């Protein structure tokens, strides 16, 4: 039986966080949750993660800063930045692999998650050979 993908969901808005957690668990994923950047970095460092869904606007540490720290340690793990604000600065997208509007339908979110997980699985063997340089963040 294949291992369930592990997704780290990070959002300071609990309703959205719980909704995404339920959706992803129903689709067969194992979901870790964090309500802030420091907690997310701790979970990311201590658990194997296949994908990160990361809110941009959070107190203390915005998502782009969290993504930069994550990519410094594990550049091969895909990160999707979430926001209700479609007007993020281009610099906010530097360390992420995708941007997802919080207004996306659950079906579209699942398609994006599946695509990013497929990319992760595709590049994981290559990253093992190249020391994590098989692909780079956007």
Located regions from the model:
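Active-site residues of response regulator receiver
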Residues: 11, 55
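Two-component/phosphorelay signaling modules centered on CheY-like receiver
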Residues: 14-32
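Acidic, metal-coordinating helix/loop segments flanking the phosphotransfer/catalytic sites
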Residues: 33-51
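Acidic catalytic/metal-coordinating carboxylates
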Residues: 35-39, 61-66
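Short amphipathic alpha-helix used as the core "switch/output" element in two-component signaling
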Residues: 42, 64-75
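Receiver (REC) domain active-site loop signature in two-component systems and cognate sites
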Residues: 58
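CheY-like receiver
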Residues: 120-138
């Amino acid at each position: 039986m294949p291992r369930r993908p592990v997704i780290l969901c990070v959002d300071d808005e609990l309703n959205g966080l719980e909704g995404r957690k339920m959706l992803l668990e129903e689709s067969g994923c194992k979901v870790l949750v964090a309500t802030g950047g420091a907690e997310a970095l701790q979970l990311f460092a201590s658990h194997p993660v296949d994908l990160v869904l990361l809110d941009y606007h959070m107190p203390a540490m915005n998502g782009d800063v969290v993504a930069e720290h994550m990519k410094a340690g594990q550049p091969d793990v895909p990160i999707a930045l979430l926001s209700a604000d479609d007007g993020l600065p281009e610099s906010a997208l530097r360390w992420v692999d995708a941007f997802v509007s919080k207004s996306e339908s659950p079906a579209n979110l699942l398609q994006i998650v599946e695509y990013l997980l497929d990319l992760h699985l595709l590049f994981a063997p290559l990253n093992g050979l190249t020391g994590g340089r098989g692909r780079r963040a956007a």
